[in-house]
């Protein structure tokens, strides 16, 4: 685990302990059972593919550790509706506060504003966070293989699947891919950002995608800015893309989303 992830785990463990004191697991699980049913994250992506379209997981992100504040006029419901109007298949909402200025209530607000399935984008280290995600309406959770050992990843995945949610398993090297393939979830996200240096290159996806069995559902993450980037990744059978920063910086998010997904556009890549 990188030093960055170790620091994140330290504050996350403190957050989890405080949350457990405020709301015991049994109470949280009861809330999760009463929450709005999962909308089907993987199903929404496959529906886009069945229609011959790319599938976009559009991210609602206010800030990041590497870039600082990304969008000052940050309004999750407005952004969520803009993404849906632009053709997104799903939403991803940052809920981590210390590093991303996110919040669980941002996810609740974004989901309530649309009919799209929503990913809770956060660093999960405990199955308590899975129940927390479902209680707040999440349809999918994220497992970051760089942050977890195999046993913890399997426990978190099982808790999510048992609750009816989908799981996006994130990897960024061959070792993490081999470990991810031992899990049950079909979605494998290849993060083009090096979690140690924060540098991004689409070459990461190009190297790892051919190693993933065809029955898995590949997602390209980070470093994706233009239709040319989507075309480049599609050459290695990646048809689903998680994009946040490049869209969040646009004045007209709906128009930017439509432009990104336009297959006939081919401006030079801005990702490298």
Curated annotation (Swiss-Prot):
Alphabetical keyword list: Amino-acid biosynthesis, Aromatic amino acid biosynthesis, Decarboxylase, Lyase, Tryptophan biosynthesis
Pfam families: IGPS
EC number of this enzyme: 4.1.1.48
Coiled-coil residue spans: none
Catalytic activity reported: 1-(2-carboxyphenylamino)-1-deoxy-D-ribulose 5-phosphate + H(+) = (1S,2R)-1-C-(indol-3-yl)glycerol 3-phosphate + CO2 + H2O
GO BP field: L-tryptophan biosynthetic process
Gene Ontology terms, MF aspect: indole-3-glycerol-phosphate synthase activity; phosphoribosylanthranilate isomerase activity
UniProt-listed HAMAP family: IGPS_B (MF_00134_B)
Protein name: Indole-3-glycerol phosphate synthase
Species annotation: Bradyrhizobium sp. (strain BTAi1 / ATCC BAA-1182)
């Amino acid at each position: 685990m990188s030093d960055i992830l170790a620091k994140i785990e330290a504050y996350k463990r403190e957050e989890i302990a405080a949350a457990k004191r405020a709301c015991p697991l049994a109470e949280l699980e009861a809330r999760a059972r009463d929450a709005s049913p999962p909308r089907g994250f993987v199903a929404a992506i496959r529906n886009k593919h069945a229609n011959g379209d790319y599938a976009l997981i559009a991210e609602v992100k206010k800030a990041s550790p590497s870039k600082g504040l990304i969008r000052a006029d940050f309004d999750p419901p407005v952004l969520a509706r803009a993404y849906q109007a632009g053709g997104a298949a799903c939403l991803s909402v940052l809920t981590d506060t210390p590093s991303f200025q996110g919040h669980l209530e941002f996810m609740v607000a974004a989901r309530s504003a649309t009919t799209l399935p929503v990913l809770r984008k956060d660093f999960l280290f405990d199955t308590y966070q899975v129940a927390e995600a479902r209680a707040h309406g999440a349809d999918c959770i994220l497992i970051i293989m760089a942050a977890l050992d195999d046993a913890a990843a399997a426990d978190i995945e099982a808790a999510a699947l048992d609750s009816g949610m989908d799981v996006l398993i994130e990897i960024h090297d061959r070792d993490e891919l081999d470990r991810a393939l031992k899990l049950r979830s079909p979605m494998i996200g290849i993060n083009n950002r090096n979690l140690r240096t924060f540098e991004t290159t689409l070459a990461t996806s190009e190297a790892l995608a051919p190693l993933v069995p065809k029955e898995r559902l590949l997602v390209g993450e980070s470093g994706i800015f233009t239709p040319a980037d989507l075309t480049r990744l599609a050459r290695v059978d990646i048809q689903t893309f998680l994009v946040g920063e490049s869209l969040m910086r646009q004045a007209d998010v709906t128009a930017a989303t439509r432009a990104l997904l336009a297959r006939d556009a081919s401006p030079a890549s801005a990702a490298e």
